[in-house]
Amino acid sequence: MHLRLLLVLLLMLPGLASASLSAQRLQDIRLEAFAACSNLLAFYNPNQQAADPRHLERYRQGFHGVQQLLAGQGDAALEEAAAEMRSRLEELERVPAGQVELYPDRIIPLLKAHARLDHRAAELYAAAPPAEQRQLTLHRLSLDIERLLLLYQSRAFSMIGMYVLDVDDNTVPQLDGQIHQGFADLAAQWPGHSAELAKLKQNYDFIRPRLLQHDRAWVPGSAAYYLGQVTTRLAQLDAE
C-alpha cells in the first residue's frame, strides 16, 4: 500500500511531468510564443509614427499564455527559455520612450530564447505527434503562417535577421508554398470544413502580396490582423 502511494506521488513530481506534455499543449505553447514575438516586433517597430496599443496587449497576452501553458509541466529547457524571454521582455519595456537604438540589444536575445523554446517544443512534439493526420497538417499549417508573419515583422529590424533568423532568398517563397499546400491537404483530409478553409485561404491570399513583395508598402498591422484571423480560426477548428 505504501509502495503504491509512493509511486503515485513520484508521478506527480514536476520533474516527471514533461513526459505528459501532449502534442496539443506543445502546439499551443508554440503558437502563443510566435504570436507574442510577432506582436512585440509590430509594437516596437521603429519605423512607425505611433505604436498600436493592440499589439502591446496581444504580446503580453501571448507571453502570459506561454507561462500558463508551461506551469507545472516540468520541462527544464522550455522553462529556462521562457524565463529568458520574460527577462528580456522586462528589459525592453524599461527602455525609455524614443530610444529605438536600444531595442535590438533586448530583442535579439529574446528571439534567440524563443528559438530555443520552439526547438525544444518541436523535439517533444516529434516524439509524440497527434494520432490524426489532419490535426498534424493543421498544426504544420498554423506554424508555417506564424513563421511567415514573424519573418515579415522582423524586416523592420535589419540587424535581427543577421543575428537570429536563419533565412535566405528562398525562405519566404518556400513557406508560402508550404502554406498553400497545407490548405490543399487539409481541405482534402477534412472535406466537411473545405468551404471554411477556402475562406481562410482567401484571407491569406489577400495579404500575401505584401508578405512576398518587399517593394510594397509596409503593413505590419494588416499582416498581423489577417494572418491572426487565419491562425485563430485554425486553432478553434483544432479544438472542436
Kindly give the residue locations of the regions a language model identified.
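Sec-dependent signal peptide recognition
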Residues: 2-9
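N-terminal signal peptide c-region/cleavage motif recognized by signal peptidases
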Residues: 14-18
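Short, recurring structural edge motifs at helix starts
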Residues: 20-24, 126-129
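Solvent-exposed loop and edge beta-strand segments that line ligand/cofactor-binding
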Residues: 21, 25-28, 215, 219
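N-terminal extracytoplasmic segments of bacterial inner-membrane proteins
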Residues: 24-51, 133-161, 224, 228-236
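Secondary-structure edge/capping motif, primarily at the C-terminal ends of alpha-helices
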Residues: 40-51, 70-73, 92-99, 124, ...
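Heptad-repeat alpha-helical coiled-coil/4-helix-bundle sensor or tether segments in soluble regions
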Residues: 54-116, 137, 183-217, 221-232
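Extended amphipathic alpha-helical interaction segments
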Residues: 103-198
